[in-house]
Design a protein with these regions (language model features):
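A positional/architectural concept
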Residues: 1-47
C-alpha cells in the first residue's frame, strides 16, 4: 500500500487524478473535496 504520494498533477478527472512521480504516472482515486484543491501542472502531496 502507498501511504503518500508527491509529484506533479498531470490530469484531473471526475473521481481521480494522475500524479507523476519520477516519470511514473499514478492514478489516485479520491474525494471531490481533494480533487478541487489540486491544480494541473503544480506539485501536490496526497496522503
Amino acid at each position: 500500500m502507498i501511504a503518500s504520494l508527491r509529484g506533479t498533477v498531470i490530469n484531473i478527472g471526475l473521481s481521480s487524478a494522475v500524479i507523476e512521480c519520477n516519470g511514473v504516472g499514478y492514478e489516485v482515486v479520491t474525494t471531490p473535496n481533494t480533487l478541487s484543491q489540486l491544480v494541473r501542472g503544480e506539485e501536490a502531496l496526497v496522503l
